[in-house]
Amino acid sequence: MELLHYTGISIVKNAPVEKNSAFKVLNRISHTRETFFKTPFEVINIPKPNNSAYTAHALRNHMDLPWFENPPGYQFLHCLINSAKGWNSSAIDAFAVADYLRKNEEKIFDILVNTPLKFRDKDYTQEAVRSFYGSAISLTKDGDYNDIRYSIATLDALDCHPDKMDSVYKALHRFGNLLHDAKFQINFRLEPCDIFSFNNRRLLHGRTEFDPNSGHRHLQGYYMDRDEIIGRLNYLKKIKP
């Protein structure tokens, strides 16, 4: 749990492989967060998907639910089956990318911190349109990194002054390229019994495409608020200093 909190990523090995069994692991931390996807949500290839995750297509590195005012702090993807060719996972520490820009490309960094972006989702299964404005990089009062809000698939039309449009586009393009740069990204393959655990507002995740005729891939996903992880860590430190 400390690894997850301080680095933004961990992979639990040798978890149970039965459906819904990740509850046994996660409930040792705290309760999960419910969303309209339900809990757990099934990451499988389906005929009429309401989200690109439910296809065999590749996904660019992204965070989940950026159109929420308060996106889930942590996500857990429990691998039940992964026998298909392809569909390898990727992860990138967006805080490290932001820090690179802060130190080397300050103008782009400032644009990403100070420009509200609109993220939008239209879900036919819920008969709902959700949207929220937030900057790609947000900082704490002390200037540390608080959140990354980025998903090119759900980024709506830019809503900024025409004079700033070109510079904002260029900043987003640069940020998007770095969020797929090999020097920041790791690639791996999830195996059955793995729980890929990560900070949804720091670590962006993606995957390669797969051939649905070559086998199956089934993940179950869970969310948890950041407060639950931090609260449990604070408690454990208090009783076990």
Model-derived features with residue positions:
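Active-site environment of non-heme Fe oxygenases that use a 2-His-1-carboxylate facial triad
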Residues: 1-241
